[in-house]
Amino acid sequence: MDSDRKYLLERVDEAAVAQVYADGFDELPIDQKILIWHLYRAALAGRDIYYDQRHALSLEMREVLEEILTHADEIDPDVLAEIERYTKLFWINSGPYNNLTARKFVLRCTREQFVQAAVQAEKNGATFGFACHAGVEVCLDRMMPMLFDPHVDPVVTSKTPGAGRDILEASANNFYVGVSMADLETFTERYPLNSRVVKNGGGIVEEVYRVGGKYDREIREIV
């Protein structure tokens, strides 16, 4: 091992960001290098699928966070540092849940400070895209429980939801939308590892992950 190499790049709370070296890559034949490049591009194309599966608001939250950080002029430095800390954890964990514990982490600034930062970012030219067609303050209100309240959707998959609570309804993930365990008693999933189940207009629909189906755009880029 080369003692001059730097492996630990940064620590963010309990998370460590490590650098990995691809020893031997330069010696690979060109066809294997091309394969690795395509796999890398496929991973980038598909990463938003995992974000969306973890929570329905993950992609919109990430967009707002990144727009604030890239349009940060005149935002309070302490608030900006906290938003940066939270965003780094968001990137590391592919969403607002710790990959090891599956529990949600939250921002440590106030709601008012976060809104002020977003409004200032918008003045600086931030465009929040699909997340905020109605204006940043209106759309942020919808995200606030996810950003600040540890008791709202606290865990990705709730295995012990408590008396009277349904496992699916108590889980934060985006695999079952509006569906309870009772709903599934008379419903058979055809693609249980490759679909999302949604209660739609009183009926239950299985949205299959495939070209022409759920995540069409991402899967087309992957394949």
Predicted ranges, named:
Residues 2-222:
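N-terminal helix-rich structural modules
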